[in-house]
């Protein structure tokens, strides 16, 4: 399809390209580097949106930063007009879910996308509001991940849980 390549398994070498309103993962295992998966930004957290939300009219968010480690893709979003962005989105490819991190009290803080990764561009919605997992601001300029020594092991993946730094 236009947003999903023919290979099922995640490539050992992935090239991830972020444009302002689209994120594309290319299969670096293949010398032709075909598209493996595309995420389109659409909609607003709190109403219908894709797994990567774009934001409402006049408050559109662009991708500012990405990182990938241990099956987790994190995407930072920042409002193009300087107001509050849509936050930080985590996509977990092994556990097959998306989660958005936002400010406490913003509604939908650490909410889970209602569809698996295969439904990432389906204009669904997020559910839940967990202020205990809030971030300081929804305006994301940069993101990085690392696995710290003695990091806990994710029981679903068997991989160490990365620490996510957000600026």
Residue ranges with predicted function:
Residues 1-11, 51-71, 128-161:
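Structural signature of eukaryotic scaffold interfaces centered on beta-propeller domains
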Residues 74-79, 99, 154-156:
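Generic local-structure boundary detector
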Residues 12-17, 71-82, 162-167:
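Short beta-strand elements that form the blades of beta-propeller/WD-repeat-like
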Residues 29-59, 94-144:
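Surface-exposed loop and turn segments in beta-propeller and other repeat-based domains
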Residues 15, 23, 66, 73-75, ...:
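Generic structural hydrophobic/aromatic packing signal, biased to beta-strands
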Residues 1-29:
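Non-catalytic protein-protein interaction scaffold segments in large eukaryotic complex-forming proteins
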Residues 19-36, 80-95:
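Structural motif
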């Amino acid at each position: 399809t236009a947003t999903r390549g023919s290979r099922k398994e995640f490539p050992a070498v992935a090239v991830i390209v972020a444009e302002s309103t689209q994120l594309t993962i290319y299969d670096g295992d293949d010398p032709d580097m075909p598209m493996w998966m595309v995420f389109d930004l659409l909609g607003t957290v709190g109403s219908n949106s894709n797994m990567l939300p774009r934001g409402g009219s006049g408050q559109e968010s662009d991708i500012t930063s990405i990182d990938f480690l241990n099956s987790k893709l994190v995407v930072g979003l920042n409002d193009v007009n300087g107001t509050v962005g849509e936050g930080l989105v985590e996509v977990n490819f092994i556990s097959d879910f998306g989660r958005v991190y936002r400010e406490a009290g913003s509604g939908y803080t650490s909410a889970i996308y209602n569809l698996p990764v295969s439904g990432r561009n389906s204009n669904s919605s997020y559910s839940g509001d967990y202020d205990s997992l809030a971030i300081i601001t929804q305006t994301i300029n940069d993101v990085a991940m690392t696995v710290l020594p003695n990091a806990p092991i994710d029981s679903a993946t068997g991989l160490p849980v990365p620490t996510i730094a957000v600026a």
